[in-house]
Amino acid sequence: MANEFRVCDDCQATNLKTLLPRLKEIDPDAKVEIGCQSYCGPGRKKSFAFVNNRPLSAPDEDELIEKVKKKLKK
């Protein structure tokens, strides 16, 4: 089963220009869905992504990427 990343294109703490290439680097075959994830509260303050339907957030993008890598290794 392919991995899935879901990210918001409207949240203030998420920069799609830098986040999407980094997610694709982790798994080039993953399905990526861009749009509102109804995660607005945390999305104002933290970088986040849904990985295989599970929300992951971190104070910055670097920490988020580390969490994504760790999640996919399980």
From Swiss-Prot:
Domain of life from the UniProt record: Bacteria
Sequence similarity: Belongs to the UPF0741 family.
Organism: Bacillus licheniformis (strain ATCC 14580 / DSM 13 / JCM 2505 / CCUG 7422 / NBRC 12200 / NCIMB 9375 / NCTC 10341 / NRRL NRS-1264 / Gibson 46)
Protein name as annotated: UPF0741 protein BLi03984/BL03913
